[in-house]
A protein has these predicted regions:
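Short, small-residue-biased leader/transition segments that mark boundaries at the very start
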Residues: 2-9, 176-180
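Conserved alpha/beta-domain cores
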Residues: 10-171, 175
Length: 180
């Protein structure tokens, strides 16, 4: 193909190496096909905004204690492992920089009445409970608020789950490079 031959010419003469932002296995595969030599930033929070993943994330956010969070995180772990496996496989040994969960938790919950009612129905709780939780998660300045390492310090089980997903796959890859 024309794109393929252009890439071969580029690879022969360029010194520039491009790393991309990729948050899904599909993004990583597309980036690799366009010549990316790694992922400069994989934002794990972008992995959670669809289907069953968002439900499990919301369950974790609504959990009242560490045990409840661990139960929800046990549902999230296989999703994380599958996403990381796909990303690592697509990158075929190229470097991947992973950022652990960073955004404020309020980004994972609906702010409109219809979405909150759907969440309440799905979770088996009252609309008022959801509204109270959503309000309690809002911050005046979320860019400096409860996110990143502060979130990890408050809820270390989140960091533990993500670390388990990443390192578990890394260990598999080291021992059996073709298994990923």
């Amino acid at each position: 193909s024309l794109v393929g031959s252009e890439m071969c010419i580029r690879d022969r003469y360029t010194r520039l190496q491009v790393r991309t932002n990729a948050d899904t296995p599909h993004d990583a595969e597309v980036a690799r096909n366009f010549g990316a030599v790694g992922i400069g930033l994989c934002r794990t929070e972008h992995m959670f905004f669809e289907g069953e993943k968002i439900k499990a994330m919301r369950e974790m956010i609504l959990a009242e204690d560490a045990e409840g969070r661990r139960k929800a995180l046990a549902k999230i772990l296989p999703y994380q492992q599958a996403d990381f496996k796909g990303i690592f496989k697509a990158m075929a040994g190229c470097p991947v920089t992973v950022r652990l969960l960073d955004p404020p938790l309020h980004e994972f919950v609906p702010h409109d009445l219809k979405g909150q009612q759907e969440m309440a129905d799905t979770m088996g709780v009252s609309l008022q409970y959801i509204q109270q939780r959503v309000e309690s998660l809002c911050e005046h300045n979320p860019m400096l608020g409860h996110r990143g390492c502060r979130l990890g310090n408050t809820y270390p089980e989140i960091t533990q789950m993500q670390t388990r997903a990443i390192l578990g796959l890394s260990l598999i890859h080291i021992s059996e490079p073709t298994r990923l």
